[in-house]
């Protein structure tokens, strides 16, 4: 919970002249490089790819089993999102800080529910997408290098899209199938 609270105060964007700046399309693709943990801490933020790396390293350092996942929509923008799920007592704990719309801590007994919840918040029309579990690549990768790493070296994960809802449990929300 403390990790999520701290990261929720961090910014979103690409470092440009010492500041985080939100860039889109070709500007993002040309300027972005995956950040090291120290760069992420220095700039107090990054994009979801950097948040996932930071969360993974933070949890791993504390001995908490976790996986990073990469979603790529097959839309005209090839929209992506990366996220971290920690495993505890047969539940997945999904920590979200970079996707402002759904910041928080979520718990679910089903990866299907977690991924479906994220997809529902990424797009109005969930159709074709890829989901991969990936091992953290080195920092300094370009946009294309990172995306290729996740697609070609990541482990394909197949889920069933389900309708979900959340139940507020105070410090966290539970994601359940409707």
How should these model regions be labeled?
Residues 1-178:
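A structural boundary/capping signal
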């Amino acid at each position: 919970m403390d990790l999520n609270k701290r990261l929720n105060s961090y910014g979103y964007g690409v470092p440009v002249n010492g500041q985080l700046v939100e860039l889109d399309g070709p500007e993002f693709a040309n300027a972005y490089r995956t950040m090291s943990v120290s760069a992420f801490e220095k700039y107090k933020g990054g994009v979801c790819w950097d948040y996932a790396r930071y969360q993974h390293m933070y949890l791993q350092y504390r001995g908490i089993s976790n996986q990073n996942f990469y979603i790529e929509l097959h839309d005209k923008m090839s929209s992506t999102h990366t996220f971290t799920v920690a495993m505890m007592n047969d539940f997945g704990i999904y920590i979200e800080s970079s996707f402002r719309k759904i910041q928080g801590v979520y718990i679910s007994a089903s990866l299907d529910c977690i991924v479906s919840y994220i997809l529902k918040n990424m797009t109005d029309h969930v159709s074709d997408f890829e989901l991969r579990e990936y091992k953290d690549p080195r920092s300094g990768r370009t946009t294309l290098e990172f995306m290729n790493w996740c697609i070609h070296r990541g482990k394909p994960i197949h889920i069933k899209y389900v309708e979900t809802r959340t139940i507020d449990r105070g410090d966290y929300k539970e994601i359940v199938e409707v």
